[in-house]
Amino acid sequence: MDSSHVTESQGTLLFNEPLAEYTTWRVGGPAARLYKPANIDDLALFLSRLPFDEPLLWLGLGSNSLIRDGGFSGTVILTQGCLKEMTLLSDNCIRVEAGVSCASMARFSARNNLSEGEFWAGIPGTMGGALRMNAGCHGGETWQSVIEVQTINRRGEIRTRKPEEFEVAYRHVAGLGDEWFISAKLQLTPGNKETSLQLIKDLLAHRAKTQPTNEYNCGSVFRNPPGDFAARLIESCGLKGVSIGGAVVSEKHANFIINHQGTATAANIEALIHLVQTKVREQTSIELIREVHIIGDANVQTR
């Protein structure tokens, strides 16, 4: 890729950049290129100058993603720390950019006396990722609050879209096509600051008690099948504590795979994911569907 046009951009372009530090599993090989946009306009300019066939990967906080050990041979767009504006609007609405962490969004809405966004505190990702997969927990889902979204395509063209243009389901949003979410307008419910902040505190305490928050993990690995829970199925198959290399099925919550003390490779984690799926299928006839996106090249290459 000819990167001479980047001199006109305001963001930061890095080459052969290790991706492990940008993911919550702390694994993954390097990206051929990684771009940190200065703002949405800068992102649009950068994309407009990219070759149309350039492979693109969008990363927020790097949860819900397994980057393989061979890395990614295209360009990674990093939104965390970049697209981070939150604006309080009228009618109990907030405009939030894709790089804002879900936890920050939860606190911002609570401090502005808005409720029904407290659940975001329990999601270890960005709002862009939450929009992409309709992330949720504790009875809340992201798209229950969406009024409109802004998307951008690989030409750098931005447009505003309404929820009815998408098919939104449990941990799935269809209809995005070759576009990415860059911001959203969300409508919440009038609430009480102290009540919401206490709810967030309680939620985080429950999360720390029931999930391996002190270990490298990506969040839930599998979707819950209809009428059941992935964690229950995995535990019922005797898979808690099962390991491949440094990848371990958490003893605390069976739907989490941890990178124990940072010793796992992406290949270890991917192999353990497949092992869990196989054992659950063999013992229960239920196919666990991944929430995690597996990305990149399996083989480590010399660049």
UniProtKB/Swiss-Prot annotation:
Residues in FAD-binding PCMH-type domain copies: 27-191
Q: Molecular function (GO) terms listed?
A: FAD binding; UDP-N-acetylmuramate dehydrogenase activity
Q: Where in the cell is it found?
A: Cytoplasm
Major location, coarse class? cytoplasm
> Any idea of its EC number?
1.3.1.98
Where along the chain is the active site annotated? 171, 220, 291
Cellular component GO terms, alphabetical: cytosol
The superkingdom listed in its UniProt entry is Bacteria
This enzyme catalyses: UDP-N-acetyl-alpha-D-muramate + NADP(+) = UDP-N-acetyl-3-O-(1-carboxyvinyl)-alpha-D-glucosamine + NADPH + H(+)
Biological pathway: Cell wall biogenesis; peptidoglycan biosynthesis
* Cofactor(s) of this protein: FAD
Enumerate the UniProt keywords alphabetically: Cell cycle, Cell division, Cell shape, Cell wall biogenesis/degradation, Cytoplasm, FAD, Flavoprotein, NADP, Oxidoreductase, Peptidoglycan synthesis
Listed GO biological process terms: cell division; cell wall organization; peptidoglycan biosynthetic process; regulation of cell shape
**Record-linked HAMAP family:** MurB (MF_00037)
Q: What does this protein do?
A: Cell wall formation.
What protein name does the entry list?
UDP-N-acetylenolpyruvoylglucosamine reductase
Species, as recorded: Legionella pneumophila (strain Paris)
Recite the lineage of the species: Bacteria, Pseudomonadati, Pseudomonadota, Gammaproteobacteria, Legionellales
